[in-house]
Amino acid sequence: RDRSPSRGLGDVYKRQYYLLMTLSRNCGKMLWILFLFLFFGAFQIVLLYLFGQSIIAVDMFLNLVTTNSSEAMELLGNLTPAIVVVVILYIPALVLATISIVRKRMLSAAFIRRERKRAFVVFGVSLLSLAGAYVQDPGYELKSDLYPLNVCYNVGLAFQRTALTQNYHHTSKDFTFHAQATHPEEKQEVYVMVVGETSRALNWQLYGYERETNPLLVQQSGLVAFPKVLTESNTTHKSVPMLLSDVTACSYDSIYHRKGIITAFKEAGFRTAFFSNQRFNHSFIDFFGREADTFDFIKEDSLDFSYNPSDNELLKLVEQELAKGAKKQFIVLHTYGSHFNYRERYPSGDAFFTPDYPVEAERKFRDNLVNAYDNSVRYTDSLLARLIGMLENQGTDAALIYTSDHGEDIFDDPRHLFLHASPVPSYYQLHIPFLIWMSDSYREAYPEHWEAVTANKEKNISSSSSFFPTMLDLGGIKTPYRDDSQSVATPLYKMRPRVYLNDHNEPRPLDDLGMKKQDFHMLEKQEINT
């Protein structure tokens, strides 16, 4: 269903403000009293500029505290038109309101009484139209559909989730996976889980893209690329925790009582490591990463705010970890992948598709944006190929699994959508790459996994539901929290109906999200079931 603000920006919305403005003869005073709603309006303008629809979601408020400063600055630098509009609309009004307060300018009592009566009449009529909305649409909800009540409700949810997150270490401290290793104790083995960022399947050569964005991986033996994989969230702070734990869209609120996959491997006797090329986000990604024996958020290693290491810097840490020679090793990488600004995700000398500059967030620069984006995908190709090469050189049983947290809009159709994390997702934000690689010795030792992976390749898969159990399955980690019906490394895998984690942490079918016909056309074109 459509959750755009246009559903609430009607008579009820306009008249309630007009009625409130009649509560004081000093208009400036009332304007400042209603400042919170002015802030919502300014925020909404920026949101509409980015996504073209939807009210301010809970996730948008949470992003204010989970998005790191470098990401925020990269984005704000490309939102100039929206920021200019906000400044023109709101700053003069607030200045005039301040002058009105200081100079004690008052409207006449007669004028206020007359306008208040008119506002009451029109407000009453608009309430009747609201009742009509309930009759016409049985699914109509004040908390979801009436602006600004829906935004206020979302603010409350954001505060609630923030409090739960801050209490996470207390609510999860007694959790255990009861994990056990099932592979032979004497065998040396290494497993690597790579979580990418903002990489969409449509731009991967492995999935039929006409450009050479995966020149190395297309030649890689022992690699299976799953073409029909969707994420259950288009936001990093939700998607990545689902990849790193057993929670899914159907059980997301249990995350406050869970630990991550690193703890499962630790319980089974593995040496663990977590290396990230992202800054702290003060949420579950940090919590799960810090469970490891060794962890490093490399952007936090420098006091220089502008420090911008490439993802390949993570390979140095992997090399050091492998050199420790532990018999059982589990390594998790969280890359920066293809996050905007795309041009900053790879060294200038690695630009293959040009021109890749300028890349401002404008439709007229789409060709440049796509070039830069494809260069970032090509850089991920190099990263994964080098990582696989390092594992091959170990000569041990090894497996690697990769997916991205979500995809990206790049002005792909007449809607002119850009970036990700929009309250209503698009096809381009949902369809992501999903890869599994196994070493020769691993395939010889566990042929049943290789057979299952190749047999499940063309099936519809949710990364959010399958990444965790598949990694545990490949690693031979047995736990009651491993759902084998969602592991693509077993013949027990079963396709489930598609769901998406909405802004209120509820699982919803794709046709109940407000997605447009263009999105379903693209899903159908890719032969992806909805």
Language model regions located:
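Histidine-centered active-site microenvironments of extracellular/periplasmic hydrolases
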Residues: G208-E212, T396-D397, T403-P447
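Membrane-interface soluble catalytic domains
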Residues: C27-L31, T263, F280, G389-N393, ...
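Short beta-strand segments
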Residues: F274-S276, F330-G337, D374-V377, A399-S404, ...
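Transmembrane and membrane-interface helices of multi-pass
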Residues: R1, R7, D11-Y147
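Active-site rim elements
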Residues: L142, A249-S251, S302-F305, R366-R378, ...
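Active-site-proximal alpha/beta segments of enzymes that process anionic O-linked groups
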Residues: V125-M193, T198-E360, S463-S464, P469-Y493
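Metal-dependent active-site segment of extracytoplasmic phospho-/sulfohydrolases and closely related
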Residues: V192-M193, S376-L419, F468-L472
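A long, amphipathic alpha-helix that forms part
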Residues: K316-E319, Y357-L400, I436
